Regions:
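N-terminal beta1-alpha1 cap of cysteine-dependent amidohydrolase-like domains
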Residues: 1-82
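Structural motif
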Residues: 7, 82-86, 117-118, 155-156
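Glycine-centered flexibility sites
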Residues: 9, 87-88, 118, 122, ...
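Short, flexible loop segments at the rims of nucleotide/cofactor-binding pockets, characterized by
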Residues: 9-13, 61-65, 93-96, 135, ...
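Short, glycine/serine-rich, charged loops/turns that create anion-binding
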Residues: 12, 39, 89, 123, ...
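Short, surface-exposed connector motifs at secondary-structure boundaries
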Residues: 29-33, 88-89, 152
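Non-catalytic interaction surface on structured domains
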Residues: 35-39, 63-76, 85-114
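Active-site-adjacent pocket-lining segments in enzyme domains
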Residues: 79, 94-115, 122-202
Length: 202
Protein backbone atom coordinates (compact mmCIF):
# COMPACT_ATOMS: atom_id res chain seq x y z
CA UNK A 1 0.00 0.00 0.00
CA UNK A 2 1.17 3.53 -0.73
CA UNK A 3 2.16 6.02 1.93
CA UNK A 4 -0.75 8.43 2.09
CA UNK A 5 -1.36 9.55 5.67
CA UNK A 6 1.36 11.44 7.53
CA UNK A 7 0.85 12.05 11.25
CA UNK A 8 3.21 14.80 12.41
CA UNK A 9 4.03 14.96 16.11
CA UNK A 10 4.70 18.69 16.14
CA UNK A 11 4.29 22.00 14.36
CA UNK A 12 5.37 23.08 10.88
CA UNK A 13 7.63 23.45 9.03
CA UNK A 14 8.67 19.83 8.38
CA UNK A 15 12.41 19.84 9.06
CA UNK A 16 13.18 16.18 8.35
CA UNK A 17 14.09 15.70 4.68
CA UNK A 18 13.21 12.00 4.83
CA UNK A 19 9.59 12.94 5.57
CA UNK A 20 9.51 15.65 2.90
CA UNK A 21 10.91 13.29 0.28
CA UNK A 22 8.28 10.66 1.06
CA UNK A 23 5.55 13.22 0.45
CA UNK A 24 6.94 14.83 -2.70
CA UNK A 25 8.75 11.98 -4.42
CA UNK A 26 5.88 9.91 -5.72
CA UNK A 27 3.74 12.58 -7.32
CA UNK A 28 3.49 15.96 -8.92
CA UNK A 29 1.89 18.33 -6.42
CA UNK A 30 -0.13 21.13 -8.00
CA UNK A 31 -2.68 21.98 -5.34
CA UNK A 32 -2.52 21.90 -1.56
CA UNK A 33 -5.58 22.55 0.58
CA UNK A 34 -4.95 23.52 4.20
CA UNK A 35 -7.71 23.21 6.79
CA UNK A 36 -7.17 25.38 9.84
CA UNK A 37 -9.18 27.34 12.39
CA UNK A 38 -9.33 31.05 12.98
CA UNK A 39 -6.95 32.68 15.40
CA UNK A 40 -5.33 36.10 15.43
CA UNK A 41 -2.57 36.41 12.88
CA UNK A 42 -3.31 32.99 11.35
CA UNK A 43 -2.42 33.99 7.78
CA UNK A 44 1.35 34.61 8.12
CA UNK A 45 1.66 31.25 9.90
CA UNK A 46 0.27 29.37 6.90
CA UNK A 47 3.49 29.64 4.90
CA UNK A 48 5.17 27.40 7.47
CA UNK A 49 2.97 24.58 6.18
CA UNK A 50 3.69 25.20 2.52
CA UNK A 51 7.24 26.58 2.28
CA UNK A 52 8.83 23.13 2.09
CA UNK A 53 6.59 22.20 -0.85
CA UNK A 54 6.89 25.57 -2.57
CA UNK A 55 10.61 24.98 -3.07
CA UNK A 56 9.88 21.73 -4.94
CA UNK A 57 6.85 22.98 -6.87
CA UNK A 58 7.11 26.70 -7.65
CA UNK A 59 3.69 26.83 -9.37
CA UNK A 60 1.86 25.41 -6.38
CA UNK A 61 -1.72 26.50 -5.76
CA UNK A 62 -2.69 26.71 -2.09
CA UNK A 63 -6.08 27.20 -0.46
CA UNK A 64 -6.61 27.99 3.21
CA UNK A 65 -9.99 26.93 4.57
CA UNK A 66 -11.42 27.74 8.00
CA UNK A 67 -14.32 25.41 8.62
CA UNK A 68 -15.11 27.15 11.92
CA UNK A 69 -15.92 30.46 10.21
CA UNK A 70 -17.10 29.58 6.69
CA UNK A 71 -19.25 27.13 4.79
CA UNK A 72 -17.13 24.95 2.52
CA UNK A 73 -18.25 23.30 -0.71
CA UNK A 74 -15.93 20.30 -0.69
CA UNK A 75 -16.68 19.63 -4.36
CA UNK A 76 -14.54 22.68 -5.17
CA UNK A 77 -11.49 20.95 -3.70
CA UNK A 78 -11.59 17.51 -5.30
CA UNK A 79 -8.40 18.14 -7.29
CA UNK A 80 -6.17 18.61 -4.24
CA UNK A 81 -2.98 16.54 -4.31
CA UNK A 82 -2.16 17.18 -0.66
CA UNK A 83 -4.52 17.97 2.20
CA UNK A 84 -3.04 19.49 5.36
CA UNK A 85 -4.93 19.68 8.64
CA UNK A 86 -3.24 22.20 10.86
CA UNK A 87 -2.34 22.33 14.51
CA UNK A 88 -3.65 24.47 17.34
CA UNK A 89 -6.35 24.08 19.96
CA UNK A 90 -7.10 20.36 19.80
CA UNK A 91 -10.60 20.51 21.28
CA UNK A 92 -11.58 23.31 18.91
CA UNK A 93 -10.18 21.35 15.96
CA UNK A 94 -12.18 18.29 17.03
CA UNK A 95 -15.36 20.35 17.38
CA UNK A 96 -14.78 21.86 13.93
CA UNK A 97 -13.54 18.93 11.85
CA UNK A 98 -14.89 15.72 13.36
CA UNK A 99 -18.08 15.40 11.36
CA UNK A 100 -19.43 13.13 8.64
CA UNK A 101 -19.06 15.63 5.78
CA UNK A 102 -15.36 16.20 6.42
CA UNK A 103 -14.78 12.48 6.96
CA UNK A 104 -16.47 11.68 3.63
CA UNK A 105 -14.30 14.26 1.86
CA UNK A 106 -11.05 12.96 3.38
CA UNK A 107 -11.89 9.32 2.61
CA UNK A 108 -12.87 10.22 -0.95
CA UNK A 109 -9.59 12.08 -1.43
CA UNK A 110 -7.54 9.21 -0.02
CA UNK A 111 -9.26 6.86 -2.46
CA UNK A 112 -8.31 9.25 -5.26
CA UNK A 113 -4.67 9.02 -4.15
CA UNK A 114 -4.27 12.34 -2.32
CA UNK A 115 -1.90 12.58 0.63
CA UNK A 116 -3.24 13.74 3.99
CA UNK A 117 -0.88 15.39 6.48
CA UNK A 118 -1.99 16.19 10.02
CA UNK A 119 0.07 18.37 12.33
CA UNK A 120 -0.40 17.88 16.08
CA UNK A 121 -4.15 18.51 16.62
CA UNK A 122 -4.71 17.77 12.94
CA UNK A 123 -2.97 14.40 13.34
CA UNK A 124 -4.78 13.51 16.56
CA UNK A 125 -8.27 13.99 15.16
CA UNK A 126 -7.67 11.57 12.28
CA UNK A 127 -7.86 8.59 14.63
CA UNK A 128 -11.01 6.77 15.67
CA UNK A 129 -10.26 7.81 19.24
CA UNK A 130 -8.28 10.89 20.21
CA UNK A 131 -6.02 11.16 23.26
CA UNK A 132 -6.06 14.77 24.49
CA UNK A 133 -3.17 15.30 26.89
CA UNK A 134 -3.63 17.29 30.13
CA UNK A 135 -1.02 19.62 28.58
CA UNK A 136 -3.47 20.27 25.76
CA UNK A 137 -6.65 21.44 27.49
CA UNK A 138 -7.60 24.06 30.04
CA UNK A 139 -9.03 21.46 32.45
CA UNK A 140 -5.61 19.75 32.61
CA UNK A 141 -7.34 16.37 32.40
CA UNK A 142 -6.71 13.30 30.27
CA UNK A 143 -9.54 13.19 27.72
CA UNK A 144 -10.45 10.51 25.19
CA UNK A 145 -12.58 11.90 22.37
CA UNK A 146 -14.02 10.61 19.12
CA UNK A 147 -12.15 11.36 15.90
CA UNK A 148 -12.56 10.78 12.17
CA UNK A 149 -11.63 7.10 12.26
CA UNK A 150 -8.94 6.91 9.57
CA UNK A 151 -6.97 4.61 11.88
CA UNK A 152 -8.29 2.51 14.74
CA UNK A 153 -5.73 -0.06 15.94
CA UNK A 154 -3.89 2.58 17.99
CA UNK A 155 -4.03 6.17 19.24
CA UNK A 156 -1.22 8.71 19.06
CA UNK A 157 0.22 11.26 21.41
CA UNK A 158 1.89 14.41 20.04
CA UNK A 159 4.60 16.75 21.34
CA UNK A 160 5.63 13.73 23.41
CA UNK A 161 9.13 15.01 24.14
CA UNK A 162 8.48 18.73 24.60
CA UNK A 163 5.43 18.09 26.79
CA UNK A 164 7.26 15.40 28.77
CA UNK A 165 4.06 13.41 28.34
CA UNK A 166 5.10 9.85 29.20
CA UNK A 167 3.28 9.55 32.53
CA UNK A 168 0.09 11.02 31.05
CA UNK A 169 0.29 8.76 28.00
CA UNK A 170 0.78 5.68 30.18
CA UNK A 171 -2.27 6.60 32.28
CA UNK A 172 -4.36 7.25 29.16
CA UNK A 173 -3.34 3.89 27.74
CA UNK A 174 -5.11 2.22 30.66
CA UNK A 175 -8.38 3.88 29.54
CA UNK A 176 -8.24 2.54 25.98
CA UNK A 177 -7.69 -1.03 24.89
CA UNK A 178 -5.15 -0.22 22.16
CA UNK A 179 -1.62 1.18 22.31
CA UNK A 180 -0.91 4.92 22.22
CA UNK A 181 2.06 5.58 19.94
CA UNK A 182 4.17 8.51 21.13
CA UNK A 183 5.26 11.06 18.52
CA UNK A 184 7.98 13.58 19.34
CA UNK A 185 7.92 17.09 17.89
CA UNK A 186 9.91 16.08 14.80
CA UNK A 187 8.50 12.56 14.40
CA UNK A 188 6.11 11.32 11.74
CA UNK A 189 3.99 8.17 11.63
CA UNK A 190 3.33 7.11 8.03
CA UNK A 191 0.17 5.12 7.21
CA UNK A 192 -1.51 3.73 4.14
CA UNK A 193 -5.02 4.90 3.25
CA UNK A 194 -6.57 2.13 5.36
CA UNK A 195 -4.76 3.31 8.47
CA UNK A 196 -2.09 0.60 8.61
CA UNK A 197 1.32 1.71 9.85
CA UNK A 198 4.03 1.69 7.19
CA UNK A 199 6.82 3.24 9.24
CA UNK A 200 7.71 5.71 11.97
CA UNK A 201 10.29 8.38 11.18
CA UNK A 202 11.98 10.03 14.16
Amino acid sequence: MDEQIFLMGGNPPIKNHTIVNKIVSSSMIERIVIFTIFRDNWQPYMKKYTEVFQSHFPNLNTDYLLLDTEQIDFDSYLDADVIIIGGGNTEKYIATYVNQNFKNYIKHMLNKGAKVIGFSAGALLLGEKVYVSPNDNSDHQIKIKNGLGLFSQFLISVHYDSWNDKANKDRAEELVNVPIIPLNDHSCLVLDKLGNIIEKID
